[in-house]
């Protein structure tokens, strides 16, 4: 806009997209609301973050409250390890919640026809201008679409009336309505209201989708601050910069007193308006008072709707006040900066000066906090992914064919698992591991043996067999006392001690503890009865030619551990002639020796040999 076209009744404001630099727009809005509120009656355009400020100006939202909201969002972004890139930080979600709170119920009616928002259609990247809204939700959706930066704010673009849109700055970052549009940008360039950057003499610049940006050092800093928020002090200076730049523009257009006039400290005592003016500028709560006070300070000032050519300078103005820009370094802008705008920054600085923030100021604590944040970043990513999936499932109802596919897949996996289970036998193999010393000798513990002996649980058949064995031992002791059994008795073909030891239940337990089992197999038969199968070693070949040789095997086979003896199952029909040694089967802690056909019972066992032998002579646990 040129000075020739600076007619206030025709001026339209246009706020460019700038990310977290929208605090600069807040300073510009504060100056306009205080010194030129008539500019808010026309159209206001905005892209990205500029659309939020434009909506606040039209709906009459308190600028101080809006600034507090901006600082709140910045504080939450800076508290994360990776700032706004942290997966738990939802920028658009926070902005949406705040807009739903601060906007009045009829905001969409106030913005219809006056608020112009620049959008970029996701399908073809064409610019779309929106100025009609059906509800507050419709208005907020348009603002969210204009603020969405791909990958920075998310992956899926938001929708406005069923169509996906992204940041309006991608196609038009500085929307222009007509030649009377006043452009506002936080970047130094050719915009009407922008930082002048007096200390830079760069004449080079770039046009970013309608926004003029000069190649200056400060602009590089501002570009980084767009997406990565700065400290509270930096944001305070940016807001003050916007207030001063807007006030300078209004002064050039004759819509506000000269900056130098506002800083005059001595006013004629005969002019009562001077005292009222200083009081009003210190309070700054009523924009109408400020406008009313500024008129008496002028010798002959036209109204705000008059042309700039009819404007007369104030009594204390010099010849160059209205024709040239005055550097901000030469005036004290902060002296007449509204106090209501200072309060949000003072509160934010006070919060940063707490004891916790003081502890966080130490370098070691900052490094430790950063390291912890980086270490738990993968867990935060996983949690954010789960939340996104949950939100997607809540919003999108999967079709029936997808549910059937997943159900079929689950049934297939479960069926394969059951098939794999059936291929394996459910058994447990126990291998005895004996403790030895440095010389290889087995270490025996009488205490542990007694405890293990107590822990043996016998089945009903084993208990009956144990009673039978004890009854036989009792009979042998009675015969021994009566003198009917002697070592020289011709009827006794066995050594009395060896027969007693081999056939006794205690000897069976001692034998199993002193000899390591090569293999012990526990299984259940078709009747779900637990059975035991064991293999032991034998040192000598034991032929089945005579009963005396078999008896000799009973005496000496228990001490050797050099030869493996195969033990057939109970249902195996293995011929005895094919086996070179008697099978030794251990069931429930007992040893049973299979005799050959030529073997005969000597009658000294105490058991009736004429009694029919049961089919399963083994003892089971």
Swiss-Prot record:
Topological domains annotated Lumenal: 65-621
InterPro entries noted in UniProt: Acyl_Trfase/lysoPLipase, PLPL, PNPLA_dom
Pathway: Glycerolipid metabolism; triacylglycerol degradation
Annotated consequence of substituting residue 303 to A: Abolishes phosphorylation by aak-2 and kin-1. Attenuates interaction with lid-1
Spans traversing the lipid bilayer: 44-64
Cytoplasmic topological domain residue ranges: 33-43
Function: Catalyzes the initial step in triglyceride hydrolysis in adipocyte and non-adipocyte lipid droplets. Component of a feedback loop involving atfs-1, atgl-1 and hlh-11. Promotes fat oxidation in response to mitochondrial stress. May play a role in the response of the organism to starvation, enhancing hydrolysis of triglycerides and providing free fatty acids to other tissues to be oxidized in situations of energy depletion. Acts coordinately with lid-1 within the lipolytic cascade to distribute stored energy to tissues.
Name of this protein: Patatin-like phospholipase domain-containing protein atgl-1
Upper lineage: Eukaryota, Metazoa, Ecdysozoa, Nematoda, Chromadorea
């Amino acid at each position: 806009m040129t000075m020739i076209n600076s007619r206030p009744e025709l001026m339209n404001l246009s706020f460019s997209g700038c990310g977290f630099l929208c605090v600069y727009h807040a300073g510009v809005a504060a100056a306009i609301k205080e010194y030129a509120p008539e500019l808010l009656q026309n159209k206001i355009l905005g892209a990205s973050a500029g659309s939020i400020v434009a909506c606040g100006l039209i709906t009459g939202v308190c600028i101080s409250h809006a600034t507090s909201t901006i600082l709140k969002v910045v504080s939450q972004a800076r508290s994360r390890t990776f700032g706004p890139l942290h997966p738990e930080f939802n920028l658009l979600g926070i902005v949406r919640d705040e807009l739903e709170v601060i906007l009045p119920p009829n905001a969409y009616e106030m913005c219809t026809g006056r608020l112009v928002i620049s959008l970029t259609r996701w399908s073809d990247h064409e610019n779309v201008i929106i100025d009609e809204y059906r509800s507050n939700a419709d208005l907020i959706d348009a603002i969210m679409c204009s603020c969405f930066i791909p990958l920075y704010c998310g992956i899926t673009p938001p929708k406005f009336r069923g169509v996906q849109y992204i940041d309006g700055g991608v196609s038009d970052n500085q929307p222009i309505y007509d030649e009377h549009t006043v452009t506002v940008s936080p970047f130094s360039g050719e915009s009407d209201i922008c930082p002048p950057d007096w200390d830079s003499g760069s004449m080079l610049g770039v046009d970013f989708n309608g926004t003029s940006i000069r190649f200056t050092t400060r602009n590089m800093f501002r570009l980084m601050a767009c997406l990565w928020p700065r400290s509270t002090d930096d944001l305070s200076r940016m807001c003050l910069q916007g207030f001063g730049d807007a006030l300078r523009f209004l002064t050039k257009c004759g819509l506000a007193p000269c900056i130098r006039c506002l800083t005059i400290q001595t006013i004629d005592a005969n002019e009562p308006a001077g005292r009222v003016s200083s009081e009003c500028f210190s309070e700054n709560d009523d924009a109408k008072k400020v406008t009313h006070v500024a008129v008496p300070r002028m010798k002959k000032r036209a109204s705000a709707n008059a042309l700039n050519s009819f404007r007369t300078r104030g009594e204390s103005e010099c010849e160059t006040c209205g024709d040239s820009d005055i550097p901000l370094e030469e005036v004290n802008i902060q002296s007449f900066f509204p106090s209501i705008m200072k309060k949000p920054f003072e509160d934010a600085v006070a919060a940063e000066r707490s004891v916790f923030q003081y502890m966080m100021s130490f370098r070691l604590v900052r490094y430790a906090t950063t390291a912890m944040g980086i270490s738990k970043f993968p867990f935060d990513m996983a949690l954010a992914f789960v939340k996104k999936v949950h939100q997607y499932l809540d919003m999108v109802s999967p079709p029936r064919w997808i549910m059937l596919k997943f159900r079929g897949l689950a049934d297939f996996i479960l069926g394969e698992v059951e098939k794999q289970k059936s291929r394996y036998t459910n058994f447990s193999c126990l291998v005895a591991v004996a403790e030895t010393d440095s010389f290889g000798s087995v270490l025996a513990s009488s205490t542990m043996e007694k405890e293990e002996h107590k822990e043996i649980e016998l089945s009903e058949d084993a208990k009956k067999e144990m009673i039978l064995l004890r009854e036989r031992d009792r009979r042998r002791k009675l015969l021994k006392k009566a003198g009917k059994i002697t070592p020289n008795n011709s009827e006794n073909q066995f050594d009395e001690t060896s027969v007693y030891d081999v056939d006794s239940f205690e000897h069976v337990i001692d034998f199993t503890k002193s000899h390591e089992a090569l293999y012990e197999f526990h299984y259940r038969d078709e009747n779900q009865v637990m059975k035991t199968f064991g293999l032991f070693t034998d040192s000598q070949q034991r032929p089945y030619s005579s009963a005396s040789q078999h008896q000799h095997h009973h005496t000496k086979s228990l001490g050797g551990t050099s030869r493996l003896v195969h033990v057939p199952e109970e249902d195996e029909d293995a011929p005895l002639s094919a086996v070179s040694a008697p099978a030794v089967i251990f069931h429930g802690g007992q040893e049973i020796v299979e005799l050959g056909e030529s073997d005969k019972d000597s009658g000294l066992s105490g058991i009736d040999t004429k009694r029919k032998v049961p089919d399963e002579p083994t003892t089971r646990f």
